[in-house]
Each structure stands twice: as structure tokens, then as C-alpha cells.
């Protein structure tokens, strides 16, 4: 894979989609044609699974089986979209990837780390992100932002969960970043969109320069 694979992680209301859009605009200004995608979803098969997961219908199967659904969606996403785009030399910007699986299913789903690692390995089949940007914000602030963004729309099943669960996921993301500093960069997301975007652009531009692409 010769492109650049960048994932955005963080809790609800961290501003991932906004920052992805801003980074994509920056990249286009430099002549790149980035691919923007998300998880769960990103390919027709994965989007069908996304609907089942976010509707809450998969909860009855239990955390272990739900994790398999996420893995199935991820495998289809990687095979149908991410890997082909990287093979073309494209920059892929993905809203959530393996670290959300680790934090959502592995930590707050209380699933065994060995089990999670096994299905992750099968799902991505070597398609590891080059850079993961962890947008960090306290759970209370993030949920407040998510509520304002959502407006009158119904909250999805994850937004409805207890604040302690959201904070546990936040800490899980931070722990992943501590364990994998070469891949992960923690971004303070409790700032203005402009300041966050400036830092992200700086991080990405450095990588592109190192690769001789900028």
C-alpha cells in the first residue's frame, strides 16, 4: 500500500467529522484528492451493518457477537475501499477505525483483549493506519457538543450511554496513544476549530514532507 492512511479517533462530540473536512480541504489545496470515509460503514456492505449496529438491534446478541459484526463491516470496508485507495496512492481519512473497536467493544464491552486482537487482525489484514489522530475532550463537554450538533434528532445508542462509560472510553483512547506513540498523536479537542485544525495540518504536513509528497 503506497498511499497514506490517517484515522481520527475520539469520543462523542470530539469534532472528528469537522476536522476531517477541514484537513481534506487543506489537502485539496495542495493538489491531493483525499478519500473520506467512516466506520462503521464506508462500503455498501459495511453501511448495511452500520444500520443494524446503531439502531440497537445488535445488542441482543451480546458484546462478543456485536464485535464480530463490527469486524465484518471493517473487513468489507478495508477490502472494498481503503486498500484499493491506498494502492492508488491516495490519502485516506477515516472517521474511526480499530481504536474505536478497542475502546467501545474491548473496554466498555468487557471483551477479552486476545479475542479483540484476533478479530482485529483478521478484519484489517495488515491495513494499519500510518497516523491516528486522537481528538481528546472530557466526556461531559463532548456529549454537550454532540447534543447541540444533533438538535432535535434522536441520539444513537452510544450517545445515550452513561457519562462514566464515555469517560472510560476516553481513557481507553489515551492509553492506546500512550502505548503506540509512533502511530498516535493526541490532539486537545477542547479548543477552537481553527486551533485544532492548525495543529492537525502541521502534523500531517510534516509526514507528507518526510515522504517527499509536499
UniProtKB/Swiss-Prot annotation:
Entry keyword annotation includes Nucleotide-binding: yes
InterPro entries assigned: P-loop_NTPase (IPR027417), Thymidylate_kin-like_dom (IPR039430), Thymidylate_kin_CS (IPR018095), Thymidylate_kinase (IPR018094)
Protein name: Thymidylate kinase
GO CC annotation: cytosol
Species the sequence originates in: Brucella canis (strain ATCC 23365 / NCTC 10854 / RM-666)
Function: Phosphorylation of dTMP to form dTDP in both de novo and salvage pathways of dTTP synthesis.
Binding site for ATP: 10-17
ATP-binding listed as a keyword: yes
Reaction equation(s) it catalyzes: dTMP + ATP = dTDP + ADP
Family: Belongs to the thymidylate kinase family.
Disulfide partners: none
Name of the gene this protein is made from: tmk
Amino acid at each position: 500500500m503506497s498511499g497514506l492512511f490517517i484515522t481520527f479517533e475520539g469520543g462523542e462530540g470530539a469534532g472528528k467529522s469537522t476536522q476531517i473536512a477541514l484537513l481534506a480541504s487543506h489537502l485539496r489545496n495542495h493538489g491531493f484528492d483525499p478519500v473520506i470515509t467512516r466506520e462503521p460503514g464506508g462500503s455498501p456492505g459495511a453501511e448495511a451493518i452500520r444500520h443494524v449496529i446503531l439502531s440497537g438491534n445488535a445488542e441482543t446478541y451480546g458484546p462478543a457477537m456485536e464485535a464480530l459484526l463490527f469486524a465484518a463491516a471493517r473487513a468489507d470496508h478495508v477490502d472494498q475501499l481503503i486498500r484499493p485507495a491506498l494502492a492508488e496512492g491516495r490519502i485516506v481519512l477515516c472517521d474511526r477505525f480499530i481504536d474505536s473497536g478497542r475502546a467501545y467493544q474491548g473496554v466498555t464491552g468487557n471483551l477479552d483483549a486476545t479475542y479483540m486482537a484476533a478479530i482485529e487482525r483478521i478484519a484489517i489484514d495488515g491495513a494499519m493506519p500510518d497516523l491516528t489522530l486522537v481528538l481528546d475532550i472530557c466526556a461531559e463537554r463532548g456529549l454537550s457538543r454532540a447534543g447541540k450538533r444533533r438538535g432535535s434528532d434522536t441520539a444513537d445508542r452510544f450517545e445515550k450511554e452513561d457519562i462514566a462509560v464515555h469517560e472510560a472510553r476516553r481513557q481507553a483512547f489515551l492509553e492506546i496513544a500512550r502505548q503506540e506513540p509512533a502511530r498516535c498523536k493526541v490532539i486537545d479537542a477542547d479548543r477552537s476549530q481553527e486551533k485544532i485544525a492548525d495543529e492537525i495540518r502541521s502534523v500531517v504536513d510534516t509526514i507528507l514532507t518526510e515522504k517527499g509528497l509536499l
